[in-house]
């Protein structure tokens, strides 16, 4: 069976995730550090390029998944430099990674994984159940995420309700993430985007889960009104 573990796109979270969950900080304060830029922690030699075809071929920059190290609780980038403030190491996964060897993930000193539930309301990730089941069997704690395609609070609420229904029966020990990066949503006002995020997070919180908003620094600076969250 082909294993695509080495293709997994990793995201590394700054700060103490467990502590943030325990004190239940407002969603706007958790992992919304404007001074943290993913690019600042990546050495140039860590980047690799991959071809992506959909009629025409284009290349996109990816991070070599073998580049980061965690040694004795300290995180290092590919140049061997300590990443300030980073104390935990994880990844997100979806059907794009294919079949994942979760035992290998566990052996690779991965502290957690976020598993995609869906792409909006139109596409439920077909590897979600397999990933949630096998991650738990391998002893890898999981959170979940929804790649939002919402353009209104009504749709954001439905995305949250879908997430809640899909998590039934699974052990979700890390946050439920609202992934804001869709190009269509970037055309909305910051107020509307923030209201969508708040709607999603409130519904998830009411169901007993801990919500979190994921976005890149561009979205953080330009498309979200954090005073509303």
Please state what every model-predicted region is.
Residues 7-21:
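Sec-dependent N-terminal signal peptides
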Residues 1-7:
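N-terminal secretory signal peptides that target proteins for export/translocation
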Residues 23-39:
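Sec-dependent signal peptide cleavage junction
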Residues 208-221:
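Aromatic-lined carbohydrate-recognition surfaces of secreted/lumenal glycan-active proteins
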Residues 73-210:
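Substrate-binding cleft of extracellular glycoside hydrolase catalytic domains
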Residues 220-229:
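Substrate-binding cleft/loops of secretory-pathway carbohydrate-active enzymes
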Residues 37-94, 98-103:
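N-terminal carbohydrate-binding accessory modules
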């Amino acid at each position: 069976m082909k294993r695509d573990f080495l293709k997994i796109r990793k995201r590394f979270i700054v700060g103490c995730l467990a502590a943030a969950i325990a004190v239940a900080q407002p969603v706007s304060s958790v992992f919304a550090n404007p001074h943290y830029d993913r690019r600042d922690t990546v050495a140039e030699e860590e980047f690799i390029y991959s071809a992506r075809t959909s009629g025409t071929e284009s290349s996109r920059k990816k991070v070599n998944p073998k580049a980061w190290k965690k040694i004795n609780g300290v995180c290092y980038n590919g140049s061997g430099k300590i990443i300030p403030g980073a104390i935990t190491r994880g990844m997100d996964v979806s059907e794009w990674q294919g079949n994942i060897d979760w035992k290998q993930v566990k052996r690779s000193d991965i502290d957690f994984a976020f598993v995609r539930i869906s792409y909006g309301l139109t596409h439920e990730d077909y590897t979600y159940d397999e990933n949630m089941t096998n991650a738990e069997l391998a002893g890898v704690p999981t959170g979940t995420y929804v790649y939002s395609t919402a353009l209104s609070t009504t749709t954001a609420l439905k995305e949250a309700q879908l997430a809640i229904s899909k998590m039934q029966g699974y052990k979700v020990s890390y946050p439920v993430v609202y992934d804001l990066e869709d190009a269509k949503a970037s055309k909305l006002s910051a107020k509307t985007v923030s209201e969508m995020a708040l709607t999603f997070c409130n519904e998830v919180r009411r169901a007993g889960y801990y919500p979190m908003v994921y976005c890149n620094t561009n979205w953080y600076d330009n498309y979200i009104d954090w005073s509303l969250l």
